[in-house]
C-alpha cells in the first residue's frame, strides 16, 4: 500500500470512528428525552407543581421563608463519581424546568462536575405563591440561599434564556461567588420597551397564559427554538410544561407566569452588561428570534426584535471578559437542538477558563 493510499485509509478509518463515537454519544444524550416523550401521555394533567411528573434525577426541597411566605424550592443535586472540584449551577428558562437540563447535566456529571439544577420559585415543582414581588434580585437571593444551604460558596453559574438574565443578575450581586458565567441565548439583551413594544399588563399576560396548551407551546418552540424543525426528543419538555396548565391549579400557574413575564419585560439586563466582573462565555444560536411580548408588538417592528445574530455580538462587546461562540444553524435552545456541538463548545469554554 502506497503512502497516499495509506493516508487515505487512515483518514477513512478515523472518520468512521469519529462518526460512530459521535452517534453513540448523541444517542446517550438524547435518549432520556426520547424515552420520556414515548412514555408521556398527550395532554396529560401533571398538577400545578408537576406532582404527576417524574424528574430524571432525585428531587430535593429547600424550605425557606420569603416575603412572609413559606416556600419550597425543588432542585436536583447531581454528584459525579469522580469529582473535579467544580460545581455548575444550571438555571432554566421561562418555558423550561430543571428537568429540561437533563442532557447537559448528564454530560457535565460524566466529566466530573457537580451539577445543581433548581426550579425557581414560581416554576415547575417549586412553590407558586398567590402574592409575590418577582424581581431578578429576589430570585438571586433565593438562589444564593439554596447554595449557602448546600455549602456551595463558589460555582459556575450557567443560565439559559430567562435563566441567563438571572445568572447575570446573580453575578452582578455576588461576583465573589461566581467562578464563571455561562449564558445560553439569554433574553434581556435588548430593551423591548425602548424598541416600541407597548406595556402588556399583568392581566393581559394572565389571560394569555390561561390559554396555554401543548399545541400552542409546540408551534412556538418549533418556529423560535428549533428553526422550523421538530424531533421526537423536543416533545417531552412541551408535554411537561403544558401539563401544569391543565386541570385543577391551572389558575395559580397562569398567574405566577403572568407575574414572571412582567418581571422579564420590565427588567432588561442590557444596561448593566459592562459591569460584569467575571469571565463570561456566551453560547448563542444565531437563528433564535425570541423577544418577550413580541406578539404584543406592532407588526412593523417585529422583524427588528430578537435578532440573535446581532444581539450575541453586541453583548460580547459590552461584557469585559466575554468569549462568544455562535452556532449558525441553531435557535433558542442549542443545548437540546444539537447537544454534540453544544456540549463540545461548552466543555472547551469552561475548561479553557480554568
Q: Which residues make up each language-model segment?
A:
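Alpha/beta-hydrolase-fold catalytic nucleophile elbow
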Residues: 119, 184-187, 283
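Flexible "cap/lid" loop of the alpha/beta hydrolase fold
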Residues: 168, 172, 181-211
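Conserved HGGG/HGGXW glycine-rich cap/lid loop of the alpha/beta-hydrolase fold
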Residues: 67, 71, 78-125, 345
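Conserved serine/cysteine hydrolase catalytic core
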Residues: 246-312, 317
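Active-site loop/oxyanion-hole signature of alpha/beta-hydrolase fold enzymes
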Residues: 63-69, 76-81, 110, 120-158, ...
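An N-terminal hydrophobic leader/cap segment in hydrolases
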Residues: 33, 37-64
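Conserved alpha/beta-hydrolase catalytic His-Asp/Glu region
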Residues: 213-273
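Catalytic active-site module of serine/aspartate enzymes centered on a nucleophile-bearing elbow/loop
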Residues: 309-354
